[in-house]
């Protein structure tokens, strides 16, 4: 599981959903929650984000479009028959990506390269000690 420390910077809600903007350092990530919250007192609240290694999408160019696209450097690549594990350094944090080897083989990525990594807003979980925001 990938973990990032963040703080809430914005909350937009509809009847059943909320979109949270969170700051990870100077970068902004967005996540969707299946609950509504218009509480403005959540701003600047520290939170922990979590997402699975299988939800990390890699690209060797800035061609894909998603709300959560960042750059990182490739530390290690472990190619498997079915899946390849790629270890990234994003600022001071390690991000793990588990990518189908057939897909990974189409990319021009080597250890030491800078790549784009993405995770969809619906695939990020908000870890917290209490239920509800």
Placement of each model-derived feature along the sequence:
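Glycine/charge-rich catalytic "coupling/switch" loops of P-loop NTPases
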Residues: 2-5, 28, 35-71, 102-133
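Short, conserved beta-turn/loop elements at beta-strand boundaries and strand-helix junctions
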Residues: 11-17, 77-83
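A generic beta-sheet turn/junction motif
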Residues: 15, 24-26, 51, 81, ...
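Short, acidic/hydrophobic/Gly-rich beta-strand patch recurrent on exposed beta strands
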Residues: 19-25, 32, 85-91, 98
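Short leucine-rich amphipathic alpha-helices used at interfaces
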Residues: 33-34, 81
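Acidic- and glycine-rich mobile interface elements
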Residues: 89-109
